[in-house]
Amino acid sequence: MSLIDWFAARRKDQFVGKVSQDPEESDGLWVKCSECGQVAYRKDLISNFNVCSNCGHHNRINSDERINIIADKDSFKEFDESLSPTDPLKFKDRRSYSERIKESQQGTGLKDGVITGLCSVNSMPLALAVMDFRFMGGSMGSVVGEKITRIVETATIKNYPILIVCASGGARMQEGMLSLMQMAKISGALKKHRAKNLLYMPLLTHPTTGGVTASFAMLGDLILAEPKALIGFAGRRVIEQTLREKLPDNFQTAEYLLEHGFVDVIVNRKELKSTLTKLLKIHGVKELVQTN
């Protein structure tokens, strides 16, 4: 091998070593799109809302990034940030539930899988709940259910519209019935919110499944979804085995649900804030009065 070939091979190895297929990984300057294979400079991807500029694939983002996209700068005020899950059932599979909680808290910096609070969107008030898939797959346990219920109740008292950003594998099995009852609790709070003719919009992101889909994710006045998001209750394989037939390739995607009337609009992440602004104005939401 010549010296030139050696340097070329070395440069190639260094370049490839810095390419990541996971935009959430902190190391590496380059990210390879899992959909089309396009390699993008990480900073360019972030500035494009973590959407692939080549194919439009929406990469998964965390709750803080979601809030920054939706809320006006410095307007978000978090609620119930100290609520943390316990292990009432002393659940253990290969590892204890307590260990899994601790690991997720250390890995994400979150207490549990949702952040809730009040904010403004182009000066219009909004109650906001953002689920974070990094925390045990965004599963819904008692703390997630309690925080969402509380922010819905706050919105009802203040006459605020609500947006819940869904990203979840469903109910948290480690909490058993305590997890499942959150479906009814949140739904009940939303019914009281609706009784005051207030606007509720869920945003279904990839993935939204299980008990979340079977409850508050599908109760919105307007149901929004991100492109190609996986949305469903049971998994594709389970359904195919039960029905004993092949499902369409696009089954359980946002586009499939839009076509069949389960989703009202698919919103590109870059257009989310402007879309929310239009919807809030259409529904008569007034701008907050600024006080000194």
UniProtKB/Swiss-Prot annotation:
Record keywords, A-Z: ATP-binding, Cytoplasm, Fatty acid biosynthesis, Fatty acid metabolism, Lipid biosynthesis, Lipid metabolism, Metal-binding, Nucleotide-binding, Transferase, Zinc, Zinc-finger
Annotated ranges, domain CoA carboxyltransferase N-terminal: 29-292
Stored InterPro entries: AcCoA_carboxyl_beta, Acetyl_CoA_COase_Trfase_b_su, ClpP/crotonase-like_dom_sf, COA_CT_N, Znf-ACC
GO molecular function, one term: carboxyl- or carbamoyltransferase activity
Cofactor(s) this protein requires: Zn(2+)
Catalytic reaction equation(s): N(6)-carboxybiotinyl-L-lysyl-[protein] + acetyl-CoA = N(6)-biotinyl-L-lysyl-[protein] + malonyl-CoA
Record's cofactor remark: Binds 1 zinc ion per subunit.
UniProt cross-references to PROSITE patterns, sorted A to Z: COA_CT_NTER
Pfam family, one: Zn_ribbon_ACC
GO cellular component: acetyl-CoA carboxylase complex
Signal sequence residues: none
Pathway: Lipid metabolism; malonyl-CoA biosynthesis; malonyl-CoA from acetyl-CoA: step 1/1
A Gene Ontology biological process term: malonyl-CoA biosynthetic process
Compartments reported by the entry: Cytoplasm
Assembly information from the UniProt record: Acetyl-CoA carboxylase is a heterohexamer composed of biotin carboxyl carrier protein (AccB), biotin carboxylase (AccC) and two subunits each of ACCase subunit alpha (AccA) and ACCase subunit beta (AccD).
Protein name: Acetyl-coenzyme A carboxylase carboxyl transferase subunit beta
Protein's gene: accD
